[in-house]
Amino acid sequence: MAHSRARRRKRASATQLYQTCKASGTCPPDVIPKVEQNTLADKILKWGSLGVFFGGLGIGTGSGTGGRTGYVPVGSTPRPAISTGPTARPPIVVDTVGPTDPSIVSLVEESAIINSGVPDPLPPVHGGFEITTSQSATPAILDVSVTTQNTTSTSIFRNPVFSEPSITQSQPSIESGAHVFISPSTISPHSTEDIPLDTFIVSSSDSNPASSTPVPATVARPRLGLYSRALHQVQVTDPAFLSSPQRLITFDNPTYEGEDISLQFAHNTIHEPPDEAFMDIIRLHRPAITSRRGLVRFSRIGQRGSMYTRSGKHIGGRVHFFKDISPISAAAEEIELHPLVAAAQDHSGLFDIYAEPDPDPVAVNTSGSLSSASTPFAQSSLSSAPWGNTTVPLSLPGDIFIQPGPDITFPTAPTVTPYNPVTPALPTGPVFITASGFYLYPTWYFTRKRRKRVSLFFTDVAA
């Protein structure tokens, strides 16, 4: 059978033993010297301190805090302590009042000695100036002048005709009978001169600016940042990128689906776009037309959705898609212009239009004067019929397609003319035939067509 050893109990401290055993005289031999600081170490310090002075180093059996002032470097003077608290005022000595002291304090009066019948001593008076007085029986004559004063009188008249009924007490009229002096309007009595003043700013119109040197306001254009390191540059060669970029991302079915004008795309499954450069594109921003290195560039910024988190956020890079439209030439190219009037022998640019000639054409004898090359109207038909065929020469560039114009019908002119026929003399030089029976408006030369306007910027998602 194993014997269990008794647990050792902890001994009480020396201070606790000293408090209980000092009176009974049963203290252990090491308790009293330790508490009363009478050990061998304490005795050595006491004997050594008689011949050696250590100052305020705080060497002793206590804690090593360096005394009240603390430890300082050897050979240095400690700084004086500056108290930051409020300064205490000296106490006022107050006499204490005991319970047996009387509560009534008698007034102390000084004793005064009154001598009855004895005059008060006067201070000595030194001699001063002598004053001589004389008496005269002649009365004094005073010069009194009469002064004139202007008296101001005030009279108050109450007239109920001019008083308003809503006012209980109207202001009475005051008339003054005093003299009123009016000073001249000018300070100097000399003659004055009128000096005209010049007007510097007449108006604030464009012809007369409000400032001396008007500076036009400059508006800073926002920087697009299409060529930063955060964007992947991709050049697109398909021309559909300009008009319908959605065809490069998804396949459209015009039979069952209408035209998709939205530029946001949702891909539920893995798919392959028509163009591999537009893989995982979920958004295309609005287009921007810029010029870079001598080229006109059409740009769009796309957002890829390569990865989705559980919260629904997508993670993907941004791509800058661009396509160069046309180069910008450094110098202007020379364009050859065609003549406006065609030659007489060139009949490729002639158009026939119906016009009403003069009712009574002038008869001209052209037996030997007119030739096929004399005038550009050699191929025109000159007749006296009410309707004639007039040929107008026109010259068009080579890249414009010639289309026949409409027939223009004019109202029939009266057959009676106010002009009498005149028989001219034989011509001696070239003959020019001019007609004055109609006026051909320039817009009737060509057929007016409607142009279909195409917007440069397409519907886009706000960036």
Curated annotation (Swiss-Prot):
Disulfide bonds join C21-C27. Pfam families: Late_protein_L2. GO terms for molecular function: DNA binding; structural molecule activity. Keywords: Capsid protein, Cytoplasmic inwards viral transport, Disulfide bond, DNA-binding, Host endosome, Host Golgi apparatus, Host nucleus, Host-virus interaction, Late protein, Microtubular inwards viral transport, Phosphoprotein, Viral penetration into host nucleus, Virion, Virus entry into host cell. InterPro entries: Late_L2 (IPR000784). It is found in: Virion; Host nucleus; Host early endosome; Host Golgi apparatus. This is Minor capsid protein L2.
